[in-house]
Amino acid sequence: MLSEKTIEIVKSTVPLLQEKGVEITTRFYEILFSEHPELLNIFNHTNQKKGRQQQALANAVYAAATYIDNLEAIIPVVKQIGHKHRSLGIKAEHYPIVGTCLLRAIKEVAGAPDEVLNAWGEAYGVIADAFISIEAEMYEEAAHKEGGWKDFRNFVVVKKVKESDVITSFYLKPEDGGKVSSFIPGQYVTVQINIEGETYTHNRQYSLSDAPGKEYYRISVKKEKGVDTPDGKVSNYLHDHVKEGDMLPVSAPAGDFVLNMDSTLPVVLISGGVGITPMMSMLNTLIEQDSKRNVCFVHAAINSNTHAMKEHVEAVDNEYEQVKAYTCYSAPTEKDLEMKNFDKEGFVEREWLQTIIPTTEAEFYFCGPVPFMKHINAVLTDLGVKQEHIHYEFFGPAASLQ
């Protein structure tokens, strides 16, 4: 239990964290990887280079300071981060290392006096204990489920399917021939990649793109091509070099962006680009479980060349009366225009969305590029959708949709 004095000191640093949070977390990662380079086998190098992880950590530290007198308020965030940590294999022994490096960064960047550093040291201990406790439960749950396991398990690529010009699916079965654990639609796995010539292992988290209950897991990966940045190292490696019969270490499913199976409300699934992957798991689960809930499936893509799983969604739309699917192309091809195989040209605008969603009294799930998600979140909020019915997933470190 933290003393009132400690709480007061930590809360007094909130303005400082608001101003210098990213500077502190940037320095923190420099210290961490300089002194513990083995941790580069866990963290996403691309997110480091683009500053995403630094921003996400700064947001988390700021929230911890703000709610240090009521940590229950940030337990949902702790659980969300905990899912990622468990999926990546972060353990209790990593927390003291992180704490030491974080305090050094606060001292170096902010020139914090000993009183502040001591208070933050105490606060970090309490916060770390919360993470360790929650993550320990997650490790136990993942390991003790039927077909479950701890850390990483070798899977074989039994099938590789090109879904569009940019997205390819990988069907994965356990190398040991055992069962795979069930999961909740919307969850993801971490795939571990060792690229020849690279010093460190690469970990990437991919949504499971089919319903649970199969003998395999399916992930569907976009080949990331950079415009002003390098191409996605791991996604390009998977597309170009990983073939059927190859082996990939995979973590047990994790994540809290999940379909609410207890709700009876209609479901609206909105995706942009590769954000379609968790939506496919949700859609397939609803139809395979013979759910009577109305489903509105909205997908935005550049055109039919980049549109993955198009034929499958159209088949579901035709076969199941309760499912209505809509497609929006920002730059349709001449063939698209001739075939009229989409519903709207341009973007998913408020006026159009309002005409196709059955009701605002529904469970809304969306995923895609961050600008797309910010727009959808603003539209749904403007339409009066209740916050508890708005669910979304970031592909990468959490960011703000405001």
Swiss-Prot record:
Top-rank lineage group of the source organism: Bacteria
Positions that bind heme b: 85
Protein EC: 1.14.12.17
Sites where the protein binds NADP(+): 273-278
The UniProt record lists the keyword Cell inner membrane: no
Catalytic activity entry: 2 nitric oxide + NADPH + 2 O2 = 2 nitrate + NADP(+) + H(+); 2 nitric oxide + NADH + 2 O2 = 2 nitrate + NAD(+) + H(+)
Key words of the record: Detoxification, FAD, Flavoprotein, Heme, Iron, Metal-binding, NAD, NADP, Oxidoreductase, Oxygen transport, Transport
Site positions for Influences the redox potential of the prosthetic heme and FAD groups: 84, 393
Residues the entry annotates as binding FAD: 188, 204-207, 394-397
Essential cofactor(s): heme b; FAD
Record region (Reductase): 147-402
Domain Globin span(s) in chain numbering: 1-136
Residue ranges of domain FAD-binding FR-type in the record: 150-260
UniProt key word Metal-binding: yes
Pfam family, one: NAD_binding_1
GO biological process assignments: cellular response to nitrosative stress; nitric oxide catabolic process; response to toxic substance
Active site: 95 (charge relay system), 135 (charge relay system)
Positions marked as site (Involved in heme-bound ligand stabilization and O-O bond activation): 29
Entry's cofactor comment: Binds 1 heme b (iron(II)-protoporphyrin IX) group per subunit.
Function: Is involved in NO detoxification in an aerobic process, termed nitric oxide dioxygenase (NOD) reaction that utilizes O(2) and NAD(P)H to convert NO to nitrate, which protects the bacterium from various noxious nitrogen compounds. Therefore, plays a central role in the inducible response to nitrosative stress.
Domain notes: Consists of two distinct domains; an N-terminal heme-containing oxygen-binding domain and a C-terminal reductase domain with binding sites for FAD and NAD(P)H.
Protein family according to the UniProt entry: Belongs to the globin family. Two-domain flavohemoproteins subfamily. In the C-terminal section; belongs to the flavoprotein pyridine nucleotide cytochrome reductase family.
This protein's name: Flavohemoprotein
Taxonomic placement: Bacteria, Bacillati, Bacillota, Bacilli, Bacillales
Gene of this entry: hmp
